Amino acid sequence: MDDSEKDFNLKVVLVSFKQCLTDKGEVLLDHYIAGWKGLVRFLNSLGAVFSFISKDVVAKLQIMERLRSSPQSEHYASLQSMVAYEVSNKLVDMDHRSHPRHPHSGCRTVLRLHRALHWLQLFLDGLRTSSEDARTSTLCSEAYNATLANYHSWIVRQAVTVAFCALPSRKVFLEAMNMESTEQAVEMLGEALPFIEHVYDISQKLYAEHSLLDLP
């Protein structure tokens, strides 16, 4: 994984999520992984405050990269082919076991990325639409409470809420996107977020159809 922050540019994320979707509405996992790598570089560029999320995302991306380079890689070309393959071959733990048989299944791994993507999508949209003096801690907490908080323990939720208090200003966030100006960053977010949202919506629908949204 390339964790260099200096190469981050919002345009790279936009291109990755654009290329993620085929004309048939399939989600191509190589581009999905590439888009997430860009988002991780963005989070890491802001310091340790997001490390609790970025470290977990990096671990999940590594699992997906191993699946993409495995002998079964053809089944992991798209989200749709992965779900069809793992569900039909019973490679997904559908019930809560003390010792899951498939803790690193693609479906379970992408579900964790899917949930984190929803949080980041809502937070970035909050940055895009908020005023210059908006409190990023509030924006981030609201996005977190609507998404990831539903899957975290009370202790984790409290620790995360405290960590968000150390977030930099909206201006710093926008400057970290490495555009020519904060105005251009806002404009680019407006172009990128619909693609991210579309990928999220397609994934959500697919997982719901196969009863995969509550995988342990």
Swiss-Prot record:
Signal peptide: none annotated. GO terms for biological process: ceramide 1-phosphate transport; negative regulation of autophagy; negative regulation of interleukin-1 beta production; negative regulation of NLRP3 inflammasome complex assembly. Keywords: Cell membrane, Cytoplasm, Endosome, Golgi apparatus, Lipid transport, Lipid-binding, Membrane, Nucleus, Transport. Gene3D superfamilies: Glycolipid transfer protein. Its main location: cytoplasm. One of its GO terms (molecular function) is phospholipid binding. It is a peripheral membrane protein. An N-acylsphingoid base 1-phosphate binds at D56, K60, R108, R112, H152. One of its GO terms (cellular component) is endosome membrane. It catalyses: N-(hexadecanoyl)-sphing-4-enine-1-phosphate(in) = N-(hexadecanoyl)-sphing-4-enine-1-phosphate(out); N-(9Z-octadecenoyl)-sphing-4-enine-1-phosphate(in) = N-(9Z-octadecenoyl)-sphing-4-enine-1-phosphate(out). It comes from the Eukaryota. It is found in: Cytoplasm, Cytosol; Golgi apparatus, trans-Golgi network membrane; Cell membrane; Endosome membrane. Mediates the intracellular transfer of ceramide-1-phosphate (C1P) between organelle membranes and the cell membrane. Required for normal structure of the Golgi stacks. Can bind phosphoceramides with a variety of aliphatic chains, but has a preference for lipids with saturated C16:0 or monounsaturated C18:1 aliphatic chains, and is inefficient with phosphoceramides containing lignoceryl (C24:0). Plays a role in the regulation of the cellular levels of ceramide-1-phosphate, and thereby contributes to the regulation of phospholipase PLA2G4A activity and the release of arachidonic acid. Belongs to the GLTP family. This is Ceramide-1-phosphate transfer protein.
